[in-house]
Amino acid sequence: MFYMTVQEFDVVVVGSGAAGMVAALVAAHRGLSTVVVEKAPHYGGSTARSGGGVWIPNNEVLKRRGVRDTPEAARTYLHGIVGEIVEPERIDAYLDRGPEMLSFVLKHTPLKMCWVPGYSDYYPEAPGGRPGGRSIEPKPFNARKLGADMAGLEPAYGKVPLNVVVMQQDYVRLNQLKRHPRGVLRSMKVGARTMWAKATGKNLVGMGRALIGPLRIGLQRAGVPVELNTAFTDLFVENGVVSGVYVRDSHEAESAEPQLIRARRGVILACGGFEHNEQMRIKYQRAPITTEWTVGASANTGDGILAAEKLGAALDLMDDAWWGPTVPLVGKPWFALSERNSPGSIIVNMSGKRFMNESMPYVEACHHMYGGEHGQGPGPGENIPAWLVFDQRYRDRYIFAGLQPGQRIPSRWLDSGVIVQADTLAELAGKAGLPADELTATVQRFNAFARSGVDEDYHRGESAYDRYYGDPSNKPNPNLGEVGHPPYYGAKMVPGDLGTKGGIRTDVNGRALRDDGSIIDGLYAAGNVSAPVMGHTYPGPGGTIGPAMTFGYLAALHIADQAGKR
């Protein structure tokens, strides 16, 4: 907890992920005194734990790489997949102002971004979709440049073997290490990068941490303090205007006397969703649900949403999340990406039947796990838990839950029952609680599809997105491979998430709204504390961070404009 001599700023930003840091950076560069308060002992939030991708069509990074796109195509695509659940003005504000935001950030921080070639939009065949992708990611960053603030950077979610630093575009190639020369070449490149960094005394970080680190340096240069272990407890209202926040030391009891920090111009909530609030998840989201399956930052307990709701803020899309099929490993759930796309695997429900294209975008995959429209409906989810079924050949060829190809499944995973292993499909079915006859029939039917290269039931491998994490050396379909080389494995799959989606309704400037559409003066929101501009869908890699940064930017600009700071 900090005890400041100055208890008043122009702008108070709650949360230190991408949304909060960009908002603070803009406010400071517009001449507004700004502070960031962060509940956790580290800064960066869920952004730092993520892949760090940013989905903003027609930005300067893409243009420099010669990526052929148009604003019209992006508009057609995003409006088409989001539908009418989100105000079209908000979608347009994101598309129109996102590139401007990114240029500002690149100018005022040491952040370096690059295109992720081939990382397809999640619905590339939709009108305006791009099979070649619109996602960019941060280049590896030397965290030593942070100085004393290096220690405060949020740790990475998962440890990479041998402590190598990887980018998103590395991961897809490393998964092909045993299957394609490109995998070998990429592993050599990653190894050389790591050795060079060690030889030159650098502490390279990648993915989300390589996004947050440069943003923190931008705040250092702008003189913006980031106060850690400072828990937001409530909003301060004066004369009908949100004019500050109450905070306490995160180490103190919740009953401790809070400290008031006044905000002369506005408060920007950027403190994440409610993925770690069990009561809120049970209240708003379909069963089964738990805080144990999320990979979001542990400090995200809905504090901002609850405080805004007390002031009459409207909430929207609270039933949804940035879902993804997840292996609920004890203590650290594994958000499954390539595991579902690699050939030689299927996902079945407790009836032993397939129920979706296993390789589809992860939010939609979990909607299918729950069943109904966008995962909503009466009663508990229809296909939870599910089981990812694969064989030894799959295990020998591909990365699985952070294990290298051929690496043995840890005994603690098997002992927990999250992973089961057997010499026959019938035995595997018994261990997983599945009907043996149905599982055997499902695998036999799927194997016929694998031989023909056509998934007649769910069209797996037909989309460019499916194929991105597939195996190009596997013919005739990079996503379909027979399951028939014992021993067999089953991995329990549950609807995990990167964070919750729902939150405070906002306008094009990030201002918090009431149910009647009126504005809560002085209060702004960006990131997962706010209802998403993406609605129930997910357009492509970085479709969470891109809007978080953009609406943090727009919120700070609006405050500055209202204050006459240009």
UniProtKB/Swiss-Prot annotation:
Reaction catalysis annotation = a 3-oxosteroid + A = a 3-oxo-Delta(1)-steroid + AH2; a 3-oxo-Delta(4)-steroid + A = a 3-oxo-Delta(1,4)-steroid + AH2
Per the entry, which co-factors are needed? FAD
Top-level taxon of the source organism = Bacteria
The GO terms this record gives for MF are: 3-oxosteroid 1-dehydrogenase activity; steroid dehydrogenase activity, acting on the CH-CH group of donors
The protein's enzyme class: oxidoreductase
Give the E.C. number(s). 1.3.99.4
Keywords in alphabetical order: FAD, Flavoprotein, Lipid degradation, Lipid metabolism, Oxidoreductase, Steroid metabolism
Binding-site residues, FAD: 10-39
Q: Does the keyword Flavoprotein apply?
A: yes
Q: Which SUPFAM superfamilies match?
A: FAD/NAD(P)-binding domain, Succinate dehydrogenase/fumarate reductase flavoprotein, catalytic domain
One GO BP on record is: steroid biosynthetic process
Q: Which family does it belong to?
A: Belongs to the FAD-dependent oxidoreductase 2 family. 3-oxosteroid dehydrogenase subfamily.
Provide the function of this protein.
Involved in the degradation of cholesterol. Is also involved in the formation of 3-keto-1,4-diene-steroid from 3-keto-4-ene-steroid.
Show the PANTHER family listed in the entry: 3-OXOSTEROID 1-DEHYDROGENASE, FUMARATE REDUCTASE
Q: What is this protein called?
A: 3-oxosteroid 1-dehydrogenase
According to the entry, what is the taxonomic lineage of the organism? Bacteria, Bacillati, Actinomycetota, Actinomycetes, Mycobacteriales
